[in-house]
């Protein structure tokens, strides 16, 4: 009598054996050492770089660094002849740089490994003994490990950092957010994130003063809002309009319950724009960078900016809603930084504008000055707490990291701010800001 589990066990055994026999052929194994001369062309962040022979124009795998002896393995988009700035669209090891003579290797077991020269493991694809036979760069910038049937075992599209190429997604069960770079020199996670939430896409700022990230944008209603179900995927798409030659609609499509829906049209360049990526910048702004491979000179351009007066497409936001618009502190009106709010009134704004630092948590050591007709970047996309004004102030008093509070007398709504940055001028004089300042 045949055991009821015999057939499934036998099939599993043969499947395991077939995977173990599917080795990377010797002519497809690689080992690249991070050494030698640097490239000569302009790159983002004023980096130095070493190209690797894994490419599909205009994409190429490289080592690059912005600080001595601290390299990132990355994919760039641009080609040398175009005199266009090389931009980084994917990174393997943000925050864990490798040094000179580090190695990138794909052995016969099919695991792609980035290691220091002493063998210390820095990053890997986790694909050992999973049937990988080849590494390949696809025309869309997706670097993939393939099995003998040409199916993806691993793909770079599954691990975005601060950028999404056309066809790349944020997805439930995988990476659900983009995170900004800290600075041009420092390649670690920065304070900004673009997050796929259950029913919308939101931008957050994480301040050292705040216990949790502060939301400063949540997609407009004409982006998309999910009333039933949950967002499972958001994908950057480029749809060529056959009625308009090569004009391309660049959209953020969204998926709910397995069905993809058309999202907001962010931009509509009048040429084939499939070589586009969405970037969450160091400054917390969202931009589309588009590369026109039919142009020899300066083929790369910005085709969308979220916080920008120039891209008035209906899917953009006022620059005044952008936390970084007026630096550490300032009042913004009609996209311009117009004043520095002080206890003596509104003074001329400059980049040196800054609220006075309160060094003590004792309420007797500080007071507040009032600024009328203002909102904070928190107020538009975060629900205020229903409190009396004196209770709102008390809440700020009890928080040593609170720098001020914002209050709307109509509705008795309170927002406590652990970061000031850009204040927004509004016509309603019942919208008030109270800035904490030391007693002299």
PLM regions: where:
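Beta-rich ligand-binding surfaces for carbohydrates and other polyanions
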Residues: 2-440
